[in-house]
C-alpha cells in the first residue's frame, strides 16, 4: 500500500489519544493520530515521525501521523492499514482457488474482518495490527482487549460449526524474531489465543516491509504461545 504527501517531523506531545503535537519545518502543528492505542514506547518526545498531509481542506487537523522511527526500525502505526495489507497479501495466493472475499462478515455475535471462499472452503479471518515490539519480539495487545478475547472465542465456535478460521497478526515493521501474546498486559487474551489454537483456529503472523510512504506484507513470523 502506498501513501502520498508524506512529511517528516518530530513528535512533541500527545494531549489525548486522538491528536498529537508535532514539529514540521520548525513549526508546531496539531495532527490526528491514526492509532488510538497507548503507543507509549513509540511516541517519545523528539522521535522522528512521518505524517500524511490531508488532501482536503475542511478538517480540524492538516496531518495524519502514520509512522515513527524507533532506533533503526521504521514502524507503521496506522491502525486502518492492516486490513488493506491483508487484502493485498491475499493476491499472492496463500488461499488457493480463492473466489470470494467479503469484508465485515457477521457470525453469531461477532463481526469478523473477512469471509473467504476458496474452492469448497469457507473461511473467517480476523486481522490484528501489531505495533508493539520489545527486543525484537512482537507483542499483542498493547492494552487489554475484551473485544479481542470475544473474537477468538467466536472463531473457535466457527470452527466447531464447520468453517475454517484464522487470526492473522499483521506486524507493522520488519526484523522481528517471533510473535507472542502480551500476557503481561492481558493474560486473558493470551489464554484465549492458546485455547483457540487448541480448538483449530489457525494463527498466522506476517511482518511488513515499511518505508516512509508504503507498507507491504513480508514474511511469515514464528508464533510462540506460552501457557500462563
Swiss-Prot record:
CDD domains: SfsA-like_bacterial (cd22359). Disulfide bonds: none annotated. Pfam families: SfsA, SfsA_N. It comes from the Bacteria. GO terms for molecular function: DNA binding. Belongs to the SfsA family. HAMAP family: SfsA. This is Sugar fermentation stimulation protein homolog. It comes from Desulfitobacterium hafniense (strain Y51).
